[in-house]
Curated annotation (Swiss-Prot):
Species per Swiss-Prot/TrEMBL record: Armillaria gallica
Cofactor: heme
Main location: membrane
Pathway(s) this gene product operates in, as recorded in its UniProt entry: Secondary metabolite biosynthesis
GO cellular component, one term: membrane
Annotated protein name in UniProt: Cytochrome P450 monooxygenase ARMGADRAFT_974139
């Protein structure tokens, strides 16, 4: 059979499977309201611009409903645009909405089946999350050691910001990556060319691209995973083959390094060495190597990339809103007197700095549409039908940019959290996911971001860059494409606030 005939046969089979999906699930109740689509492809074109979170809010307003739906190649997507809808399904009906859908591109082809963030809800997910919680969550015996690591590496960040302020993004990657690598693998990062930081950056970027809703049809049309790589439309397989190499290297390379040190008897205290030591002294069956390796990679991959994005947003906000920066510095000066750097013991006495962190998370949420949940069984909500297997998204961006909750939501204004202490907290409403699938490492991430923001504000002034004519350059609020909202690169000026601030920056050099 020639390739043209084979193509016709394969696509005919896929069409039959699609028709079975379309007509296989029926209900007397309607789906939630949806924008108009096209025959066969449905709303596929609405996913093309990487702005579904913004469009979904627009549709929600037009329909005067906080729940909307999309149909893409016969697959149903449900988008929840309010904290009430999110709580009703992801919290109150967690048993039906804590699963993840099949994501062939990321899981099957790129090979991210090791991360419990994407695992199906069940015993394997629970085991991986339990091990993570036992070692990384605050309140455990390792909490003070975590903060010691964060403080020490934050001091390094200040030195890097002074030495090369124009390379703030590389400095932030060094900071967040070093904390995770030290805590997880006992690895010391020397400079920005560290191979493990470069590796996680490349691997995370590939996954961010792959996770965009509708970016790869195989996620909406899983039958496509069976077509051969040379077949028309199978370019995704070739791309995934290259990305899989990054995934495998990210899982194995730092683990092999840490295990090698442990076997030689010179391992530093870290997650991997703690697990391996636990296995040596365990009376019964210890943790499998796969479980240790997988859990370490989750911390390595998730912690570094999202925290970098948030801290870059912080730098952007301070560049654009100097009055906010001055207010935070006044709070810090009143407490510290310019004589020392902040530490975690100061947190309760720096409410405005904490408000800045909340506003950064609200203004540009790292995961605007979060990761989709899956309806295990067919369900009804508000008189609408939700079919089994539907992708169910919590639209964090729509929730955190709702003008009925946050006045003037496009403006960066931390004062809103000071003026109204009961205002919806972004930390608990989408920034770290929803329900039982909320990010397990959020406490460590929040500490990493808070101490960096407080320390930078204590000793640096951040302002707009100027062009060759001396005119200020106002950076646009522009995001790079991908699932994770990274601010596009922008120039700014970062310089010590004073001679006393410079002495604090260089005191440990």
């Amino acid at each position: 059979m020639d390739s043209a005939s084979l193509a016709v046969v394969v696509w005919a089979i896929l069409l039959v499977l699609w028709l079975r999906r379309i007509f296989g699930q029926r209900s007397s109740l309607p789906l939630p309201p949806a924008p108009p689509g096209y025959p066969v492809i449905g709303n596929l074109l609405d996913l093309a611009n990487n702005d579904v979170h913004i469009r979904a809010r627009h549709w929600s307003r037009n329909f005067d409903d906080d729940v909307i739906s999309l149909k893409v190649l016969g697959k149903t997507m449900i988008i929840l645009n309010s904290p009430t809808a999110v709580s009703d399904l992801f919290d109150k009906r967690a048993s039906n909405y804590s699963d993840r859908p099949d994501m062939p591109m990321i899981v099957d082809f790129i090979g991210w089946d090791w991360t419990f963030a994407l695992m199906r809800y069940g015993p394997r997910w629970k085991e991986h999350r339990r091990v993570f919680n036992n070692h990384f969550n605050i309140g455990t015996s390792g909490a003070s050691e975590d903060r010691h690591i964060q403080l020490r590496i934050c001091r390094e960040l200040l030195s890097l910001m002074f030495q090369s302020p124009s390379k703030y993004l590389e400095n932030l990657r060094h900071y967040t990556g070093h904390i995770i690598l030290k805590r997880t693998y006992g690895h010391t990062v020397v400079d920005e060319e560290d191979p493990y930081i470069r590796l996680v950056e490349a691997a995370s970027q590939s996954t961010s691209e792959a996770a965009v809703p509708g970016a790869f049809l195989v996620d909406l049309f899983p039958s496509m995973k069976y077509i051969p790589e040379w077949f028309p439309g199978a370019q995704f397989k070739r791309k995934a083959r290259e990305w899989r190499k990054l995934s495998e290297a990210m899982i194995n390379a730092p683990y092999d390094m840490a295990k090698g040190k442990f076997d030689e008897g010179n391992a530093e205290a870290c997650f991997v060495s703690a697990c391996l030591e636990q296995n040596k002294t365990a009376s019964g069956q210890g943790l499998s190597e796969e479980l240790i390796k997988d859990t370490a990679a989750v911390a390595y991959a998730a912690g570094a990339d999202t925290s970098v994005s948030t801290l870059t947003t912080f730098i952007l906000a301070m560049t654009l809103y100097p009055d906010v920066q001055k207010a935070a510095q006044a709070e810090l000066d009143a407490l510290l007197g310019g004589e020392r750097l902040p530490d975690f013991g100061d947190k309760t006495r720096l409410p405005y700095v904490t408000a800045i962190l909340k506003e950064v998370l609200r203004w540009i949420p790292v995961l605007p549409m979060a990761v989709p949940h899956r309806a295990v069984n067919a369900d009804t909500y508000k008189g609408y039908y939700i079919p089994a297997g539907a992708f169910v998204y919590g639209n964090a961006w729509a929730i955190l940019h709702n003008p009925d909750i946050f006045a003037d939501p496009e403006t960066f204004r931390p004062d809103r959290f000071i003026e109204n202490p009961t205002l919806l907290n972004p930390i608990d409403n989408g920034v770290f996911g929803f329900g039982r699938r909320a990010c397990a490492g959020r406490v460590m991430a929040l500490d990493t971001m808070w101490i960096a923001m407080a320390s930078i504000l204590a000793v640096f002034d951040i302002s707009k860059a100027v062009d060759e004519r001396g005119n200020e350059i106002t950076p646009p609020v522009k995001l790079s494409p991908g699932t994770i909202s990274h601010p596009a690169p922008f120039p700014c000026i970062i310089k010590p606030r004073s001679k006393a601030a410079l002495e604090l920056i260089t005191q440990d050099d």
